Regions:
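Auxiliary Fe-S-binding modules of radical SAM enzymes
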Residues: 1-24, 189-265
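N-terminal [4Fe-4S]-dependent radical SAM core
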Residues: 1-70, 81-89
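Short glycine-enriched, charge-decorated loop/helix-capping segments at active-site entrances
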Residues: 48, 64, 157-163, 230-238
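Residue-level detector of family-conserved "landmark" positions at structurally sensitive sites
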Residues: 49-52, 124, 184, 216, ...
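A general alpha-helical scaffold signature found inside nucleotide-binding enzyme cores
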Residues: 70, 162-169, 243, 247
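Conserved AdoMet/S-adenosylmethionine-binding subsite of the radical SAM
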Residues: 76, 80-229
Length: 265
């Protein structure tokens, strides 16, 4: 890794070690701050802003800061401490957020450095990015965890703040380039779980040869308290029972040739 890459800086929200639900094997997940979407059900609203934010810690008292400026070299050193676990389990590094590729200079440098160190890489993305960003990082990404939050463009705009045309265009581009893709689909009761949405989602997945699994992520109210701390309005609804996700998986599995599994929002 050259000196310029090593010194590239980004705003890191958190680093999770020993993760098992964000790609294969045991993984280290680096969460970057900043996102172009404003999903009303977001469980990480503290990831929206690109700047560190300090709030009152209503659980432990005092203050809590979301986000810290770090260099690629610093984060890579932390990631590589877990390399024996990656090697033993087929794991690696996952970038998440927020939208990790919105900090493209930092994300690109970290992904390239991880690949140079022999680490498997995955990126969770909303896909609402300039094509040039996708093109820049694609050679250093082994697996894409691609968020599909709804198939209807107008409803997508209502629920996330943006249309889904660019998201779908970038997804098709990645598929054309031979990318390995898992579709990650939050399911929010009465908002995006209609028969029509599931049918269109199944058709999309079946049309993309690189998609090998669809993960269903049922609604969680995890972001409500964090949103209140930050003065942000986050959609609040009851936690759906376990059979809700099971029902979505059954309905979608009947419509698609791809594997459908339960993920976690």
């Amino acid at each position: 890794m050259d000196e310029l890459m090593a010194k590239a800086k980004g705003i890191v929200l958190d680093v999770e070690h020993s993760a098992t639900k964000d790609g294969p094997g045991i993984r280290t997940v680096v969460f970057l701050k900043g996102c172009p979407l404003r999903c009303i059900w977001c469980h990480n609203p503290e990831s929206w802003s690109f700047r560190p934010e300090t709030v009152d810690d209503t659980v432990h008292g005092g203050k809590k800061t979301y986000g810290k400026e770090r260099t690629v070299a610093d984060v890579l050193e932390e990631v590589l401490r877990d390399k024996p676990f990656y090697d033993a389990s087929g794991g690696g590094l996952t970038l998440s957020g927020g939208e990790p590729l919105a900090q493209v200079r930092f994300a690109s440098a970290l992904l390239r450095a991880a690949k140079d160190a022999g680490v498997h890489t995955a990126v969770e993305t909303c896909g609402h990015l300039p094509r040039t960003v996708i093109e820049d990082v694609r050679p250093n990404v082994d697996l894409w965890l691609y968020d599909i939050k709804g198939m209807d463009g107008e409803l997508h705009r209502k629920h996330t703040g943006v249309d889904n045309a660019l998201i779908h265009a970038n997804l098709r581009y990645l598929d054309e380039q031979g990318a390995k893709i898992v579709l990650r689909c939050p399911m929010i009761p009465k908002l995006n779980d209609s028969d029509e949405n599931l049918a269109k989602l199944a058709a999309l997945a079946d049309a993309l040869k690189g998609v090998f699994r669809i993960d269903i992520e049922p609604y969680s109210p995890f972001g409500v308290d964090k949103g209140q701390q930050l003065g942000l309005a986050v959609y609040e609804a009851p936690l759906p029972p376990p059979e809700y996700a099971e029902g979505i998986i059954r309905r979608l599995s009947a419509l698609t040739r791809k594997k459908v599994a339960k993920g976690d929002l």
